[in-house]
């Protein structure tokens, strides 16, 4: 059962796997109903997950492989009860995600899309935008991706880095903040790089956004659920 990852499917097929493609919920349910007794492995993504009732319907399931780092919708207790291995790709995409996070930050802070569109219209807008150099970057979640972002920010843009994590790290030179609010207060730019799931649900709320202030910039390369959408809309609409 795999979401569409067509470029890599031949690798699995050449390794001897018989693939059952189920990219939609209806196809997934049909595949489990039709082939449940023959399925040994499941390939999924964190937002799609794999649930207890689905695990129960696959009597010969041995492994659930999650593409990417997040596995918040995989029922770990159900897998553990059956001694089913659950794996993920933690850290594999960290460099490319970190590159993209800095690209988004540059694009946002320097207003590159709007400036590009303006030049293409033959305009020359004389607008001064902030620089990244020498600014304060707050990273919410200093895992593999957060570490890669911090490295690029320090070495590439001469930024100072602070972070908030579930626990302080003793192996980094960056300043630890005890809460997301404290981190936002100490930041010009704020990058969200946490896991998804219940533990981080709406972790970035009104209090964090208020602490970041109307001149702050925020980039979220984590799950959308980490930021309170209602609070974000309210902050934008009221220029806070």
Give, region by region, the residue ranges found by the protein language model.
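Phosphate-coordination loops involved in phosphoryl transfer and adenosine-cofactor binding
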Residues: 61, 133-137, 206, 215
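Active-site regions of enzymes building and remodeling cell-envelope glycoconjugates
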Residues: 14-20, 83-84, 172-180
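Rossmann-like adenosine-cofactor binding region
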Residues: 50-54, 166-240
